[in-house]
């Protein structure tokens, strides 16, 4: 940040009365804190795909009403790091209750969405046939039609 930007921030921490009338569409009620605490963002899974796009996967175990905001924060962080790569986002719901989260955010000046899937929609047989033990373990969370088959494959 340049010294000019810092000086302007200091000046406008308390915006002059007349300028506020010009810039603000409605009179200012109160001044709010200008700093935002920074938190380290960490996604569950991030990879570059063969087509040069970036795939982001989040696993979520409960219905979080703030999930669209979290996914937007992740999207912006990924976009900042990989600005020339298309970004594909997927939320995989692994909770016990019915999936009720929204996968989009619609505000006056912003529209944002991502893909979402309930892991129970995935046929467990695909994962059970994998040589990777983690795939087989995750199969327990997927759609299970034959529990005996599932148990045999896990043992």
Model-derived regions, located:
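Elongated, amphipathic alpha-helical interaction scaffolds
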Residues: 1-155
